[in-house]
């Protein structure tokens, strides 16, 4: 890569930014400034029409198109302002990881919603096997429509990882328990190249469920969105206990430039990608959206 410490160059300890108070569902607010201030933006290649609205569809940085306002309503405006990027650090690392996925690779996207990462995987991996899991029926329909729009074939399953202590899903959600390990067995999936998870507070429950897969080294890379500071570091601890190393991390309270924290991991024997700093939102000067 060569840019493992790139984001650290922007850190200024004299700056002390509080975390934006709202999630995407509550409106953009300071969230746009944080996303656009992420140094990872500078390392993401953008296609020619990235961020443009063409025939009612927004062009993402990787040439994937999605209907305007299809991602948390007005929050989709970040795709226009930020030239097709909505989660800079995560998208930076996802793009890097894709370089190491072989033909016939498999992705399981938990909490897939609009299926962004699944579609991207499918576009880059020859003969990709794509599995999308989403608890909310309306969100799942959004993902299906996006896949159709981008000529992507994917296997969709409605279900959620159970966690009584987690955040409650939307009214259209399926409350039936979803277990990743059981799913892998039912679908006869021999190896998971990317397990991508954004499951609203149930991430540690999910990781405990897949310990047998971790022990057997059945997962090449994990992308885990974290939803509290405690959960973030508990997820890291569990992964490291089972011989997975952290290749990128931005915690929930201080480091992430997005509302969620992010952990990217692979088995310790996999040395393809060195540890990469994702910077620190709290100590990075924010870029005003009026500068765009």
Predicted regions located by residue number:
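Glycine-rich, phosphate-binding/catalytic loops in enzymes
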Residues: 124, 149, 211-215, 240-241
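Short internal loop-to-helix segment that lines adenine-nucleotide cofactor pockets
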Residues: 81-108, 155-217, 223, 229-230, ...
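A short beta-to-alpha transition loop/helix N-cap that caps and shapes the active-site region
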Residues: 139-142, 165-167
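Acidic, metal-coordinating catalytic cores used for nucleic-acid/nucleotide bond scission
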Residues: 114, 139, 201, 228
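A short, structure-level motif marking secondary-structure boundaries and short turns
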Residues: 128-130, 219-222
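S-adenosyl-L-methionine
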Residues: 1-133, 141-145, 152-155, 185, ...
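Conserved SAM/SAH-binding beta-strand->alpha-helix loop
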Residues: 136
């Amino acid at each position: 890569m060569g840019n493992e410490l790139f984001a650290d160059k922007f850190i200024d300890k004299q700056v002390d930014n509080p975390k934006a108070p709202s999630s995407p569902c509550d409106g953009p607010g300071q969230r746009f400034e944080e996303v656009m201030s992420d140094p990872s933006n500078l390392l993401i290649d953008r296609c020619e029409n990235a961020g443009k609205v063409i025939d009612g569809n927004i062009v993402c940085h990787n040439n994937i198109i999605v209907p305007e306002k299809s991602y948390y309503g007005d929050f989709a405006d970040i795709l226009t302002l930020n030239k097709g990027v909505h989660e800079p650090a995560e998208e930076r690392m996802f793009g890097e990881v894709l370089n190491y996925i072989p033909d016939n690779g498999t992705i399981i996207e938990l909490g897939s919603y609009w299926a962004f990462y699944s579609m991207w995987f499918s576009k880059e991996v020859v003969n990709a096997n794509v599995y999308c899991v989403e608890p909310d029926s309306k969100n799942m329909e959004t993902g299906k429509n996006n896949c159709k729009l981008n000529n992507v074939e994917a296997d969709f399953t409605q279900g959620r990882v159970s966690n009584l202590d987690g955040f409650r899903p939307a009214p259209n959600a399926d409350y039936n328990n979803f277990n990743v390990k059981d799913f892998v067995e039912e679908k006869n999936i021999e190896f998971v190249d990317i397990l991508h998870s954004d499951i609203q507070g149930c991430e540690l429950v999910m990781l405990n469920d897949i310990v047998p897969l971790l022990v057997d080294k059945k997962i090449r890379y994990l992308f885990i969105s974290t939803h509290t500071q405690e959960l973030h570091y508990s997820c890291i601890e569990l992964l490291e206990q089972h011989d997975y190393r952290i290749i990128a991390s931005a915690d929930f309270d201080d480091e992430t430039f997005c509302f969620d924290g992010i952990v990217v991991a692979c088995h310790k024997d996999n040395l393809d990608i060195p540890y990469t700093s994702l910077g620190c939102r709290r100590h990075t000067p924010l870029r005003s959206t009026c500068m765009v």
